[in-house]
């Protein structure tokens, strides 16, 4: 079901027909709500979720709330898939870095090999470790994330250390 939804959504990306609805969003309340929503699922899985907001209360951005939620959910879903420690940890940090807001989602999972890092946002790309894993995804989730972020005028990148974890920044 999820694969079909992702493929359908990706076909909309290919034809530039993603239905965006841009509105002013209060950064503080929006990301707090997202973290609370995701936190319930993390708690039921025994994963510790940290939420750190370093943005002033009144900061607003123009964004599509639904599509940004898709971004957050896809990134966190990937983090959960590749957590390999007895105690999984995912941290969400929101920072004001001058002219824009930066979101960081960090996990303590298995990490991504340096050779794979440049390609993780490519359509259908899957790392060697995910190809051999029953938990491996379709390989389009992060390409969807990248397109949404770019359509919002932003950029996304990742840093990672094998055996330590991964950080997604956008």
Placement of each model-derived feature along the sequence:
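Short conserved segments within the C-terminal catalytic ATPase subdomain
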Residues: 41-52
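Conserved micro-motifs of the catalytic ATP-binding
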Residues: 15-20, 60-63
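Conserved glycine-rich
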Residues: 153-154
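Short helix-loop "hinge" at the ATP-lid/N-box region of the Bergerat-fold HATPase_c
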Residues: 79-80
């Amino acid at each position: 079901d999820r694969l079909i939804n992702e493929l359908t959504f990706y076909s909309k990306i290919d034809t530039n027909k993603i239905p965006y609805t841009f509105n002013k969003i209060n950064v503080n309340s929006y990301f707090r709500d997202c973290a609370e929503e995701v936190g319930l699922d993390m708690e039921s899985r025994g994963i510790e979720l940290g939420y750190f907001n370093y943005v002033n209360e009144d900061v607003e951005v123009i964004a599509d709330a639904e599509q940004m939620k898709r971004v957050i959910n896809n990134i966190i879903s990937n983090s959960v898939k590749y957590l390999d420690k007895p105690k999984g940890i995912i941290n969400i940090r929101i920072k004001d870095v001058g002219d824009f807001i930066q979101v960081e989602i960090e996990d303590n999972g298995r990490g991504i090999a340096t050779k794979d890092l440049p390609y993780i946002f490519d359509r259908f790309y899957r790392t060697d470790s995910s190809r051999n894993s029953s938990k491996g995804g379709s390989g389009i989730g992060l390409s969807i994330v990248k397109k949404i972020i770019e359509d919002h005028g932003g950029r996304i990148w990742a840093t990672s250390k094998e055996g330590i974890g991964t950080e997604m920044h956008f």
